[in-house]
Amino acid sequence: MEEELSGGKRDPQGLLRINATLGFGRTTIAPLVSEFAERYPSVEVQFEVTDRPVDLVKGAFDMAIRFGELPDSRLSARRIMSNRRFLCASPKYLEKYGSPERVEDLAEHRCIIHRQNDDAYGVWRYVVNDHIEAIKVKGALSSNDGDIVLRWALEGHGILIRSEWDLAKYVQSGRLNLVLPNTVLPSADLYVYYPRQTNQTARARAFIDFLVNRFQAPFTPVDVGIEARGRKKRSSRS
């Protein structure tokens, strides 16, 4: 039911359809949906998690919460969290195989491949002078599940690329070490995407503002001894 806001300000109400990535949606966004529902009991939330991006327009979704860049020119986006990517490995792996000294050395190491959407298999990208470069890596283990590849890295199976959100607590505890920490990788900032339109509903605005507030300081950033680079300063774009 569409909220009727005439005659004074009222709490948001009506149907809100939200999409999110499978693992992150289950572990992080779902509890926030629960908290939002307690605050706004007149909003009916349909929350769907998928392993691939969905067509928000065709699927009649109000928004999607995903890491990475804008996938569709028909959408607008608001960044809700900065999130760098790093190369990492366990002390066990580095003790056995050594640590690469240059990006090119990764081609000779055992790398754990996180297969995402239609990305080229085993191609890792990094930034040099504001240009994207690529290197082909190999390894015995790959998966499309982020939690699985992270577990393999913790168990010493190889070098992995993961986001700061996933790595922070393990780097701080010493269970994972950064590899080539001065290498800049494409970021994995967290965005909420929504169909480009002029009249966004009050319930959608309320949920987006709620997310931004909750992600103000979600974790202690990884300390690499240098100022964070490659982070966009804008909090929203369209």
Q: Which residues does each predicted region cover?
A:
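Flexible hinge/capping segments at coil-to-helix
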Residues: 74-85, 89-114, 129
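Short, well-ordered beta-strand segments
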Residues: 17-19, 64, 112, 160, ...
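Hydrophobic hinge/microswitch elements
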Residues: 134-178, 184-186
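Alpha-helical linker/hinge and terminal dimerization helices associated
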Residues: 1-9
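Ligand-binding cleft/hinge of the Venus flytrap
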Residues: 18, 36, 105, 122-136
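Central regulatory/effector-binding core of bacterial HTH transcription factors
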Residues: 13-73, 224-229
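A local structural motif
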Residues: 42-46, 131-140
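C-terminal effector-binding regulatory domain of bacterial HTH transcription factors
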Residues: 42, 164-173, 182-238
